[in-house]
């Protein structure tokens, strides 16, 4: 008896390496105790939310007992929250041109950035359509577009700094390509794409759309930005909306406010985009018909009250620097991440599975890079206490020595 679809069965059998390492981590922690395991496998933000979160929640709680205090809201989100988000995005993107300034009508509140992507793909993808993105990439992208018969096409990035290969992206685009998806700061590499690179990507999108003409289906530039606030060493994250009218920004507050469980995100459409009202209406519809209905009301109001603050990003920077010291002392090769809170490091000898196993024997959990389209590397998350990072130092040395021996 076939209980589930072949597509889901295949997905279950090839479950993500993050999930596999999570399960292996549970085995280690059960056997040796949680304090004896250094778990760098999950990107679960652990820094406390801003202190003002409590005050905002108290205000929300007072309103919650009023009639419809926690009732349905418009499918696109609470109007006042959408307007606040629009102004936040304008500031974040450095938008001063009135033609490109967002208002509430250009913003849809979603169930996390993931919900934004899924709702967008449902609105624009037909079976056989393609989404092109640089690799390594966030592991779930393929599933998000695959739900609707879409195909994720990945293009290897430049190995020295994980910068996108512009020529490779251009070569991957076909008449069936509906979106070019970028993620900067990047998960899993921590790379931040330069303003020059982003300008070239935007020009590529404009050139493709010029060739397709007004009667063709447009190519969209999707910028997935949940880690935008996580930029170090004076590096800035290039804005996308001013670069091309075909740009769309997605984001969430899982990391910047440590609200991962609240599942609040957004999608912001470029106001200068032809047909922007139609696309906004379509994403609002798919946000509802996919079963999300509307983003969580408490989460929306909470985010609106916290837009001018973030978690203590200095904590993540200190962890980043400590992790770099540990890896350097162990002889691990890596590009220093400029953003997010991940390291994507070379596996000695190029075998990411063998390196993952060697670290596992030292009770250190990482994720093989092949799970992100980057074989030969492993991903480490710095969303852990500094004591755990320091405690892993000798284990890294032994694992590297074993790989090189």
Where do the PLM segments sit?
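Conserved core of the PLP fold type I
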Residues: 67-216, 228-243, 389, 394
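Conserved core segment of the aminotransferase class I/II
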Residues: 245-317
């Amino acid at each position: 008896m076939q209980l589930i679809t072949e597509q889901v069965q295949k997905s279950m059998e090839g479950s993500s390496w993050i999930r596999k390492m999570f399960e292996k981590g549970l085995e280690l922690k059960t056997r040796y105790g949680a304090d004896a395991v250094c778990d760098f496998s999950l990107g679960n933000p652990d820094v406390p939310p801003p202190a003002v979160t409590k005050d905002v929640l108290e205000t929300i709680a007072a309103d919650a007992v009023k009639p419809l205090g926690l009732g349905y809201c418009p499918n696109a989100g609470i109007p006042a929250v959408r307007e606040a988000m629009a102004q936040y995005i304008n500031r974040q993107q450095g938008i001063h041109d009135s033609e490109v300034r967002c208002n509430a009508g250009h913003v849809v509140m979603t169930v996390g950035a993931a919900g934004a992507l899924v709702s967008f793909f449902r609105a624009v993808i037909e079976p056989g359509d393609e989404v092109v993105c640089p690799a390594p990439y966030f592991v779930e992208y393929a599933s998000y577009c695959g739900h609707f018969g879409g195909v994720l096409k990945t293009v290897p990035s430049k190995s020295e700094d994980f910068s996108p290969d512009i020529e490779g992206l251009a070569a991957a685009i076909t008449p069936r390509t509906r979106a070019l998806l970028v993620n900067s700061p990047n998960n899993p590499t921590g790379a931040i794409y330069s303003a020059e690179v982003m300008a070239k990507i935007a020009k590529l999108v404009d050139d493709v759309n010029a060739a397709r003409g007004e009667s063709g289906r447009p190519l969209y530039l999707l910028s997935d930005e949940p880690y935008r606030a996580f930029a170090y060493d004076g590096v800035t994250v290039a804005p996308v909306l001013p670069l091309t009218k075909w740009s769309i920004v997605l984001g969430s507050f899982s990391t910047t406010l440590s609200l991962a469980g609240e599942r609040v995100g957004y999608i912001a459409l470029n106001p200068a985009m032809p047909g922007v009202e139609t696309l906004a209406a379509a994403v609002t519809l798919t946000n509802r018909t996919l079963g999300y209905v509307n983003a969580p009301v408490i989460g929306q109001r909470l985010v609106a009250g916290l837009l001018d603050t973030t978690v203590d990003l200095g904590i993540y920077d200190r962890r980043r620097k400590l992790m770099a010291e540990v890896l350097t002392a162990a002889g691990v090769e890596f590009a220093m991440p400029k953003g997010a809170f991940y390291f994507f490091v070379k596996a000695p000898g190029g075998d990411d599975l063998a390196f993952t196993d060697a670290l596992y024997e030292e009770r250190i959990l990482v994720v093989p890079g092949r799970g992100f389209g980057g074989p030969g590397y492993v991903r480490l998350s710095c969303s852990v206490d500094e004591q755990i990072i320091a405690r892993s130092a000798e284990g890294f040395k032994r694992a590297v020595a074993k790989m090189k021996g």
